[in-house]
């Protein structure tokens, strides 16, 4: 591990030990994480005593599922599930790869509800024969408000709250864990607290960090700030790594160009 990764481990260990963090999350989908990046995050999670969760590129992204299992993920999340069929494709795809029943039982499967179409079809999704294979459902607010034609600045509005809370009520009634991501920052505190008081929310997610809600709320602003520091350190690490690689290739490019010019 390099210095940045050691700092990440230190931040994450503190978050796990004292602030309710229950996992690190990364994504082959919207984030476009590479296999090597996910391996490094997995090592950081291991060093900090927590688990890694991976969002795959789609409900039937079998290559991503295979990579996630090789890396050793605790959970797999399918994005943009908008119908019972999408849910069924996801579950069947996982089951076609994770053939060992014990491994399958220990794997947390979740889907993202993140469009207004998903919300409208939620009743049907929850009535699917395979919904009992899920650990939980995450509502992704950024894509949700975009699909509703609402500006992101209104993500904590009453209109969005009504849509989210009604969806979580159905999710909890189905016996699933209710999780929320998308625009989770210090400005969403009252939004999160309302859901918690109504018994509708179990976990929240920043881009990379997953919190168990009850413990997180005890020092919400500080906990979210620490999660942002973890993300900043990781992004700085990636920036340094890829800058080094680019500079290394640039020196090779310059050398080859020099050779070609000398041959003229």
Task: Please place each PLM-identified region on the residue numbering.
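Expand to "…catalyze enediolate/carbanion chemistry for C-C bond making/breaking, isomerization
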Residues: 1-264
